[in-house]
Every structure is written in C-alpha cells, then in structure tokens.
UniProtKB/Swiss-Prot annotation:
Keywords: Calcium channel impairing toxin, Disulfide bond, Ion channel impairing toxin, Knottin, Secreted, Signal, Toxin. The keyword Cell wall biogenesis/degradation does not apply. The keyword Disulfide bond applies. This is U4-lycotoxin-Ls1a. Its main location: secreted. Enhances the high-affinity desensitization of human P2RX3 purinoceptors. The lineage of its organism: Eukaryota, Metazoa, Ecdysozoa, Arthropoda, Chelicerata. Residues 23-44 form a propeptide. Disulfide bonds join C48-C63, C55-C72, C62-C88, C74-C86. Expressed by the venom gland. PROSITE patterns: SPIDER_CSTX.
Length: 109
C-alpha cells in the first residue's frame, strides 16, 4: 500500500511538472503571435490628414486636436468649377471647449 501511494505521488508530481512546461510553451507562442500581430498593425496604420488639408480622399482620416478629432467639412467654392472641396477643420464648439479646459488647467494648477 505504501508503494502504491509513493508511486501515485511520484506520478502526480511528474504529470504536473510536464503540464506546466506545456502551458509555458503555449504562453510563449501566444506572446510571439501577439507581438507579430502588433507589429503588423503598426505597419498598417495610415497617417492622418492635418488640419486645413484636403481630406476628400478619406473623410475619416482627420487628425486629433488636444481633446477632439477634427471633422472633414466639404463645400463647393464659388466660381466656375463645381467640384467638391473637403478639408479637415476644427468645429467652433470644440475650439471653445478646448479653450475653457486650458483656462481651467491654468487656474487649477
């Protein structure tokens, strides 16, 4: 009976050791996969369109201001040409809110 208990304890110890090594290998593989996916995602990220530049090619590509993302506004300029012109602009409400936040930061500290 003592021999059976001794072998069962030895078996359980070896089994737990082998399972932890297998889990560690899976974790390291998962970390490597995640790092490669993050590297690919950074390569895919496209540059944003700065304020007052043309955004007609991609209307959702405007850069962020301090607090808010700029908005792509489209309009038709006066004159002979009837083509639509789009540019990234900061809405006035966002501009005023950013000014209030800046003033509050200087007052508070």
């Amino acid at each position: 009976m003592k021999v059976l208990v001794l072998f069962s304890v030895l078996f359980l110890t070896l089994f737990s050791y082998s399972s932890t090594e297998a889990i560690d290998e899976l974790d390291s593989d998962a970390e490597e996969d995640m790092l490669s996916l993050m590297a690919n995602e950074q390569v895919r990220a496209k540059a944003c369109t700065p304020r007052l530049h043309d955004c007609s090619h991609d209307r959702h590509s405007c850069c962020r201001g301090e607090l808010f993302k700029d908005v792509c506004y489209c309009f038709y300029p006066e004159g002979e040409d009837k083509t639509e012109v789009c540019s990234c602009q900061q809405p006035k409400s966002h501009k005023y809110i950013e000014k209030v936040v800046d003033k509050a930061k200087t007052v508070v500290g």
